[in-house]
Amino acid sequence: MSHPLPFHSLATLFHHGRAPRHQVAFSLNEHHDWSSFTCHVHSLCEQLKQTEAPRVALCAANSYQFAIGFFALCFSGKAIVLPGNYQPAALNELSCEFDLLLCDEEVGSHLRQAYQLISDTLSAGKPASFPHLLPEQVVLTLFTSGSSGTPKAIRKTLQQLDSEIAVLEQLFGQQLQDCRIESTVSHQHIYGLLFRVLWPLCAGRAFAQTNLEYPEQLVAHASDHTALISSPALLKRLTSEHHSSPFASVFSSGGPLSYEAAMHAQTLFSQTPWEVFGSTETGGIACRQQHQANTPWQLFPGIDVELNQENCLRLRSPHIDGENWYQTADECEMVSERQFLLKGRTDRVIKLEEKRISLVEVEKRLDHLDWINESVVIPMTESDRLTLVAAIVLTSAGTAKLNDLGKGKFWLMLRGELRQWLEPIAIPRRYRVVSEIPLNSQGKRLTNQIEQLFH
């Protein structure tokens, strides 16, 4: 094993630097070293200083181009805006949040609005010197849909990101020595931003420029010198048909990873995934490896928690502001001072005909049936009446039962089973069978696509 590279914070990384030939990013056909990276950042930074736009939205499909844009914006004194995705309509919806759109060629080719290409301003000049960044003065805005589905702006400082990256290196750095980073998640969100771009840069680990998108690619790119940054959206699509191949480490975040999916990943990759629990608002809160069902979550260092009257987690964290308590909607059970079990989201409680209904509980009851592998339950208004509908993924036994009974009798059977636990008002009135629940690359449910199943 080679001697580990020194770890540097985001604020001091460019001041300390790396060896000129140190590899920063790679793809199948090329790689970029520290010398070219710093020249590219300096070149774009000088161009950005000439613009009057104080708020710049950064969108890139290529993670190397994204990293160039990110640090060029830091050093040019711009406020950084990171849209959650770069679909034209989504960017138009956020247009009031930024004054200039900075993107790479792949993103730009799909846009109708004005933009500046990162690659148009890059040149390989002489090595540049960089000052220390003032981490509390570099501000970026990320977006989360939350429970409403409407993008919500979340402000972060470089200081808060540095605080979280230092914890990640403290917890996991030793097992990632000599590793390079492959990923299936977007850097436009906090998890991918930290795990696939900024943390690797601070630790001197090369990262892939593009995403892996299919289970077959995960197997093909696996090696015992590669760490995988992924999500339940892709990990649960792995099947026994995929050949086993080891990773040095596997991370998962963005949504719940079932115990079965965790065990299957262990079988395929010789690594039980490290699951990370947190949000855009809170940053990382806790982690776990599911060596058994209902493995509790272990709090990250530096985070204090308590439960409110509804048993929802309150936390105080340096990744937020370090002083004030932040209230979450995550119902928990503390099993020790630093460990807890997640019970579900209380903001997924709705009122139907004056009764409080937990959508999480309805899904849990569906998922416990032998015929259902996974479900999602959402409220919908039909004929001026609010009701519940469910999209379900069947097990092989469920598919056989549906074929045997037919849809009408199958739905009646489901409702009959649910009546053992749920009041009639809480039982979904309509169902759709799907091959998989619609999720984005972060493992978040695509509510709009689920709603379209019932139109």
What annotation goes with each model-predicted range?
Residues 2-3, 12, 19-50, 156-159:
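Conserved AMP-binding/adenylate-forming core of the ANL superfamily
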Residues 33-34, 131, 139-166:
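Conserved AMP-binding A3 loop
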Residues 239-293:
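Gly/Ser/Thr-rich phosphate-binding loop
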Residues 331-425:
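AMP-binding/adenylate-forming catalytic core of the ANL superfamily
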